[in-house]
């Protein structure tokens, strides 16, 4: 027995040294994921009110309302409470997955120390950002850091993508986990230990929705968490997805408001009507236009210096040009 316990400790130590296991950072609220000039919005301020328990969360809100940051902050909160170990972000297309990789790259180090950030789809090898992530960071001794080696190993096969800390993929990589294919248990293992975030849920067809329901049921069986994001969901589709976690509720109760957050646990259900919460807006400010004339319609040195000084003071500066050549 002592031998077995010692080997368990050795195994944990080896996993940490290899980069497969990364230390999580303490949850610091959704504001930690936002730029300094932004304040949490109406949807984002509800993160701390969401249950700290495994479950299915369906977030319906307009485009641009901050659903991505809300989902990532909630996943961070669950990871901090030992309810998950990693994050998987599944999107409908390769283009949206590539764009999400850039956003996750900016936030990965806020959730974990030396995280493995993996992109998985059929053309991930052509993504320049992902290639730079895989080859990043050498120590002063000229040896690759463990997390870089681990990232390269995980990226060798899409089936291993979910074994890291943060995975960004197309939705098919997740759906394969419930199909009768070789080594699907590897995907299932990675998904089960993660908070699965599925974006643009309304974009999937009937067949894909059937597979997605199977994925959600598998997550419920292992006590995992899922976050579904959509601008809007048809009532029938939303009810079928929510019912995968076992607790059935009145369909009208889940569709009586918009924007809306539905949370479904194994033995509990909660809903958060965003209309009942005041929208968090930045302080009002006034704008006073000041016309400045230039012979060639280009900013002179004095104007450029004013723009730089304003930016250094925290202002958001935008220069709009009439010609493409000038803008470039």
List each model region and its residues.
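Conserved interdomain linker/interface between the two RecA-like ATPase lobes of SF2 helicase motors
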Residues: 248-327
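Post-DEXD/H (motif II) to motif III coupling segment of the RecA-like Helicase ATP-binding lobe
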Residues: 186-195, 202-273
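Conserved pre-motif I regulatory segment
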Residues: 26-60
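Walker A/P-loop
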Residues: 53-75, 204, 230
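A substrate-engagement module of RecA-like helicase motors
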Residues: 104-165, 171-175
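Conserved Walker A/P-loop ATP-binding site and its immediately adjacent core
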Residues: 86-107, 117-128, 233-237, 324-325
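Walker A/P-loop NTP-binding motif
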Residues: 68-83, 103, 215-218
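N-terminal accessory nucleic-acid engagement/regulatory domains that precede
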Residues: 1-33
């Amino acid at each position: 027995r002592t031998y077995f316990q010692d080997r368990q400790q050795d195994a944990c130590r080896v996993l940490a040294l290899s980069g497969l296991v990364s230390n999580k950072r303490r949850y610091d609220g959704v504001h930690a994921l936002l730029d300094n000039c932004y304040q949490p919005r109406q949807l984002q301020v509800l993160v701390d009110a969401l249950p700290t328990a495994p479950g299915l969360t369906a977030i319906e809100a307009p485009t641009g309302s901050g659903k991505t940051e809300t989902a990532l902050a909630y996943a961070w909160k669950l990871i901090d409470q030992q309810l998950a170990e990693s994050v998987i972000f599944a999107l409908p297309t390769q283009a949206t997955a590539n764009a999400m990789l850039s956003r996750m790259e900016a936030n990965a180090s806020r959730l974990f120390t030396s995280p493995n950030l993996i992109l998985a789809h059929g053309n991930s090898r052509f993504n320049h950002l992902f290639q730079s992530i895989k080859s990043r960071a050498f120590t002063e001794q000229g040896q690759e850091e463990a997390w870089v080696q681990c990232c390269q190993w995980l990226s060798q096969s899409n089936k291993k993508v979910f074994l890291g800390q943060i995975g960004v993929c197309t939705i098919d990589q997740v759906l394969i986990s419930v199909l009768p294919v070789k080594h699907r248990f590897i995907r299932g293992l990675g998904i089960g230990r993660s908070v699965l975030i599925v974006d643009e849920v309304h974009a999937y067809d009937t067949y894909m929705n059937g597979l997605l329901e199977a994925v959600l049921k598998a997550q419920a069986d292992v006590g995992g968490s899922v976050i579904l994001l959509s601008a809007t969901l048809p009532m029938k589709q939303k009810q079928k997805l929510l019912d995968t976690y076992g607790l059935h509720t009145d369909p009208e109760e889940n569709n009586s408001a918009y924007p809306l957050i539905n949370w479904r646990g194994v033995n509990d259900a909660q809903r958060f009507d965003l209309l009942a919460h005041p929208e968090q807006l930045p302080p009002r400010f006034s704008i006073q236009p000041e016309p400045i004339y230039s012979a060639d319609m280009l900013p002179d040195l004095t104007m450029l210096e004013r723009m730089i000084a304003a930016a250094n003071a925290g202002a958001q500066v935008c220069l709009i040009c009439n010609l493409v050549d000038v803008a470039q």
